[in-house]
């Protein structure tokens, strides 16, 4: 067959810019409001436009997380571990893209950005390994004075609202999201407001991995609009307020208390600006898994 040669390009090629969307129920919708906001580097250079999620978008995300909760919690612990490990595998294949987005958003050099991305991948692997060990480590067979067996079994809390760390757009997010998922919870995440791009790319990894739609739902936008609604939503069972600023912490905790939510927050005296997410002793802990588990105690008569 003859070879067909394409003619010289008449005009310079225009780059295809990426559209950063929300992630709700396994799909990538734009905000129902049609709004967006500009994401820039720390130096003020424009990077992209991100969707500015609305209250309705958040309600849709909570609804999707609730629908996905029971099937996700019913999966075997080993299977959840395999799925989280698969996330690490796919992140490894897109490492260069994550490095570029972390470097641009956080103002890091290529070396430090690569370190943050590789630590994020390793963190998925670390938490995946905990999936089938939670029952043995956190559960117990309790001694009782009577003809009964008494067992304590960890169970997932339900739908967890997660306000991601603002400064560490990828490693901080993974460090808070992975312990929520490994225990069988589903999540509604409000990404870093100023540095949301790596989080959106992470959802593209989740969508192409084995994580079922609705298990993770991620919103970008203004925290002043989204966080109070998340904290007060009656169908959210727990909230992680790590990314909430000190000025807003009391208000968020009061809203969470109205609907009796389980609450996880930064330890007192710990600043999000100074916390070292690369510190394996401080930033990956089984206690962070336990924060979103409830302990169910079962009594059973001996011989029955």
Regions picked out by a protein language model, each given a short descriptive name:
Residues 42, 129-212:
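Conserved small-residue-rich beta-alpha loop and adjacent elements
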Residues 178-181, 229, 255:
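Hydrophobic/aromatic ligand-binding patch that stacks against planar heteroaromatic rings
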Residues 163-164, 219-224, 242-244, 266-268:
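Glycine-rich beta-to-alpha transition loops that act as phosphate-gripper elements at the mouths
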Residues 1-148:
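N-terminal Rossmann-like NAD(P)+-binding subdomain of aldehyde/semialdehyde dehydrogenases
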Residues 148, 225-226:
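Short acidic active-site motifs
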Residues 53, 105, 115-119, 193-197, ...:
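Short beta->alpha linker loops
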Residues 187-190, 217-219, 238-240:
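Short hydrophobic alpha-helical runs that function as membrane-insertion/retention elements
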Residues 2-5, 9-12, 122-137, 151, ...:
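C-terminal segments
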């Amino acid at each position: 067959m003859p070879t067909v040669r394409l003619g010289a390009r008449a005009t310079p090629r225009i780059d295809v810019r990426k559209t950063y969307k929300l992630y709700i129920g396994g799909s990538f919708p734009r905000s129902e409001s049609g709004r967006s906001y500009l994401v820039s580097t720390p130096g003020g250079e424009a990077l992209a436009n991100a969707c500015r999620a609305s209250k309705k978008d958040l309600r849709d995300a909570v609804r999707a997380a609730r629908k996905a909760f029971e099937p996700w919690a019913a999966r075997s612990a080993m299977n959840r571990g395999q799925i989280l490990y698969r996330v690490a595998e796919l992140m490894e294949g897109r490492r260069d893209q994550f490095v570029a987005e972390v470097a641009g958003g956080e103002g890091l050099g290529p070396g430090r950005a690569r370190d943050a991305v590789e630590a994020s991948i390793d963190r998925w692997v670390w938490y995946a390994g905990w999936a089938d060990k939670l029952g043995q480590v956190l559960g117990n067979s309790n001694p009782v004075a009577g003809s009964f067996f008494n067992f304590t079994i960890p169970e997932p809390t339900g739908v967890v609202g997660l306000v991601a760390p603002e400064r560490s757009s990828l490693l901080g997010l993974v460090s808070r999201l992975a312990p929520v998922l490994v225990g069988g919870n589903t999540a509604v995440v409000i990404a870093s407001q100023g540095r949301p791009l790596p989080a959106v790319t992470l959802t593209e990894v989740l969508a192409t991995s084995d994580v079922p739609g609705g298990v993770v739902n991620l919103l970008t936008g203004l925290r002043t609009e989204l966080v109070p609604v998340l904290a007060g939503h009656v169908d959210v069972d727990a909230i992680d307020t790590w990314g909430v600023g000190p000025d807003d912490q009391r208000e968020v905790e009061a809203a969470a208390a109205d609907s009796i939510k389980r609450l996880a927050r930064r330890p007192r005296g710990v600043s999000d600006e100074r916390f070292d997410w690369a510190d394996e002793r401080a930033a990956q802990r089984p206690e962070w898994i336990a924060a979103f588990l409830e302990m169910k105690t079962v009594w059973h008569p001996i011989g029955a």
